[in-house]
UniProtKB/Swiss-Prot annotation:
One of its GO terms (cellular component) is cytoplasm. This is Superoxide dismutase [Cu-Zn]. Gene3D superfamilies: Superoxide dismutase, copper/zinc binding domain (2.60.40.200). One of its GO terms (molecular function) is copper ion binding. Belongs to the Cu-Zn superoxide dismutase family. Disulfide bonds join C57-C149.
Amino acid sequence: MSTNAIAVLRGDTVSGIIRFKQDKEGLPTTVTGEVKGLTPGLHGFHIHQYGDTTNGCISAGPHFNPYNKTHGDRTDEIRHVGDLGNIEAGADGTAHISISDQHIQLLGPNSIIGRSIVVHADQDDLGKGVGAKKDESLKTGNAGARVACGIVAIGAAS
């Protein structure tokens, strides 16, 4: 039996619903959903450490990084567990999400249930920033302000 989770994203002008599904511990987790109200283009998309939104999305803390690695792309070998790359909003401000990720888990000791998912204002540079932006790139991907977030909660069986 698979495990399901859901996050309802809220921000000043951005909202969405993200669903997670994992069939068995150690297998990839599928992430699907829709985010509305974004500016057209790419936006950083990450799992953050805490499921705390008491002070808006800033309370979510840093990217979920249980192995103490540097920031990277979703497909990179070296990355935070919470690094999910970018989502792309079309001209209507809507991003449709459909990914499978081996690193985020709903089951086991590094489960993302109870943590938060955050959409950022800017494109994530995927840890490839240079010059004055390099240090921040290796932590956050220079993805900018947090425009929406939600807590990853246990979802109903599908």
